[in-house]
Regions:
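Conserved, well-structured core segments that form or line functional sites
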Residues: 1-206
Length: 206
């Protein structure tokens, strides 16, 4: 395998968003930079948005120009601008026509969805692109001997952040977080090929 690792196939994402979200923890978000260098960081915090019945989901009111990508095939990036400032990175899940996705909220060393996209130079240009090495942004199986999917005892489930408007759905435990100290650290230049990485600090709660 190259430094970007073994990409997850589209079929991995063609499942309910909550199942995909849980299994994404510990996998690697991989970005090819403008200089051609590879950055690879473990996913440590995600949120699931289950579809039109989920009152916190962008697709609850039907397709629009902004959310059209959510109604397409699984394994495609859905990237939108929040408050006119921060790009939010999501991966589409489930069946075509059923708007569901997983929001990337944190990777090892970078916590907060806006910080992730800023730190990795991800913007709206990735919206609608498949999560493959050919597009320069993908998710790979973890390197460094990480046990994956992660054991349930490593994962905390909580309500999602910033969805108080969603009624009963605001309390659903659809945010998934893992202690980043259990995962190998990927340095800023790329992957640690020998699995000798130092542990990160635990994920900060907000």
């Amino acid at each position: 395998l190259g430094p970007g690792g073994d990409p997850l196939p589209a079929a991995f994402f063609g499942r309910p968003a909550d199942r995909v979200a849980r299994d994404l923890l510990g996998a690697d978000l991989v970005v090819r930079g403008r200089d051609g260098g590879i950055r690879r960081l473990s996913l440590v915090e995600v949120e699931a948005y289950l579809g039109a019945h989920d009152l916190a989901c962008h697709g609850r009111t039907g397709p629009t120009k902004r959310n059209a990508t959510m109604f397409g095939p699984a394994g495609v990036w859905y990237v939108y601008l929040c408050y006119g400032i921060h790009w939010m990175l999501n991966i589409v899940t489930g069946d075509v026509g059923q708007p569901a996705a997983v929001l990337v909220r944190g990777v090892a060393e970078i916590v907060g969805p806006g910080r992730v996209t800023k730190g990795l130079e991800i913007d709206g240009g990735f919206d609608g692109r498949p999560a493959t090495p050919e597009t320069g942004l993908w998710i790979a199986k973890p390197a460094g001997g990480v046990r994956w999917p992660l054991p349930a005892r490593w994962i905390e489930r909580t309500p999602r952040i910033g969805v108080d408007y969603a009624g009963l759905w605001a309390a659903k435990p659809l945010r998934f977080v893992v202690d980043a100290g259990r995962l190998p650290r990927m340095d800023r230049a790329g992957v640690d090929p020998f699995g000798l990485a130092r542990p990160t600090q635990p994920v900060r709660r907000r």
